[in-house]
């Protein structure tokens, strides 16, 4: 043994050089305790900038040895006559520290965990990987782990080691490409990142992909989180959820962005402080109950660096954003919703992720989470990267994210964003700018397999949860069972209905006669999928105008058109979704940096729209004909679909027991007196709702609450009603 080796605890020069450069691939081979072959052990610790280190007994603090610093600054070593549990007493320039040696502990991740991870079949990644507070050999600490198979070295860095990547290099578990390290005496709330020496020699600081808590943006570090300790009180809701989510049950969704629904304003009237989840629950739950929605849908709440993405460019798929509080606060919010009889759906983004340096992009110096080829892995529309769902570990990562929210947080469903971009390799790409699949086609076979697998696993692991597709193409069978060749979603957003009906309602009434089929065309395919009718955030931003501002005419006509449109929507087959602000007719487009214009509710027209939405929801829930057969063609019957000259539509909705509701819509500002409409039976039909009623700030044209039927056959029916149709109004009636 030469002098250099002897001075440095028996290490060879190449090990010393690797430690000095922070490039040692196997720190456990050189650091920590190593047997000397005679019952004793050599202990080495690499502690750059330490002034002095001694080894002391773990049980009673006896000094066992003073460690010597060799030729490599920061490398301390000592010999112990016998192997025993020990601690390091470290003297720094700013104070002293006593800790167990991270390199004295064995591997912490089990072989089965690593095997399931590599297969992509680990269902609880957030409960085993990332940063897990735990106890090893009676010592409290945190076990860190991260997948980076192509990295040359990975270290845990944070305030606890002055962000020095030389201090805590990790152990590589070769079979799975996972690096791990147990660091004693760390706890919940500690900030950290991974310093990854990539295959390309670049040394970025990466946030933990499996972090369950993060710093508040614009800071980007991960935070150690404990197990969710919330004591759930939503047992009744969870027991009844599958029944509430049946296709024959009402489903009416209030879509909202939690930061701009309500907030605390500063003196300039801008957002001064976001409400915490618990504060939000106190305000939101009574409001949603009063309006009669069955569910809320939150724009993505997974941590995202850029608030202007509205959450649709998330980087922490397991961490609720810290903007509104902790994971415990979020759990309390969901619990409060459930106890108030309100379901909670989350928008979830498995299609793509942003390119931020601290995120998933080229995580270990290679394209790890994304496709390597930009023609497959880069989304030019959003400047984002596309998940490589053909890779086991990535597929397992996304599956575990979905289950994390569904199981740990009792989420009632996920609305999967941008499904069309996942299904097609040529989505929004020109010829020559995409890579065909192995059969030469445009379908993304890996994403399709993932989606089907996701829906199957979710149905088993989270019974009763809804997985909903935002899918804008004519892909067949999106909401059909996978056993029948479908994708297996519970529902699909009906984007075609939304585009057609909004185009129609924006036309001046004098021109609507030429667009008559735009309001009725949706019924041709209404039962090809299980549909949700969405008036979402996307329709009230980017110069598209707010919902009421899309309406033509003067102020009175705009409100009448809006009320008629919403009533038409609620009476149309399909479940309902309405974005916040639309329920009271906000004039401004949605702005994520400002709360809704609640002051408008001092005006009767806005109060009227809000009251109408509440009454529509109550009617929708109370009348079986309006919800039981939303997804069954026998639940709908046209009476008048061809009166383009008068812009009138009329139809019957039927309950499963044969009870009808009549819907009549007049989309011109001209009242129609004595307009005859056939009905199947009933001596007297009562008005359940009139969108032109005075209590909605309408002109109050109607039928004085009820109409007697005449024995005059009409529209193929034996009886008929002579109705007064309100201008720009919709009537909903049923036999008295």
Curated annotation (Swiss-Prot):
Coiled coil regions, renumbered to chain: none
Molecular function via GO: 1,4-alpha-glucan branching enzyme activity; cation binding; hydrolase activity, hydrolyzing O-glycosyl compounds
Pathways per UniProt: Glycan biosynthesis; glycogen biosynthesis
GO-annotated cellular components: cytosol
Entry annotated with the keyword Transcription: no
Pfam families for this protein: Alpha-amylase, Alpha-amylase_C, CBM_48, GlgB_N
GO biological process, one term: glycogen biosynthetic process
Cross-referenced InterPro entries: A-amylase/branching_C, Branching_enzy, GlgB, GlgB_N, GlgB_N_E_set_prok, Glyco_hydro_13_cat_dom, Glyco_hydro_13_N, Glyco_hydro_b
Domain of life: Bacteria
Active site location: 417 (nucleophile), 470 (proton donor)
Reactions mediated catalytically: Transfers a segment of a (1->4)-alpha-D-glucan chain to a primary hydroxy group in a similar glucan chain
Family (UniProt): Belongs to the glycosyl hydrolase 13 family. GlgB subfamily.
Role summary: Catalyzes the formation of the alpha-1,6-glucosidic linkages in glycogen by scission of a 1,4-alpha-linked oligosaccharide from growing alpha-1,4-glucan chains and the subsequent attachment of the oligosaccharide to the alpha-1,6 position.
Subunit architecture: Monomer.
Protein name: 1,4-alpha-glucan branching enzyme GlgB
Originating organism: Pseudomonas putida (strain ATCC 47054 / DSM 6125 / CFBP 8728 / NCIMB 11950 / KT2440)
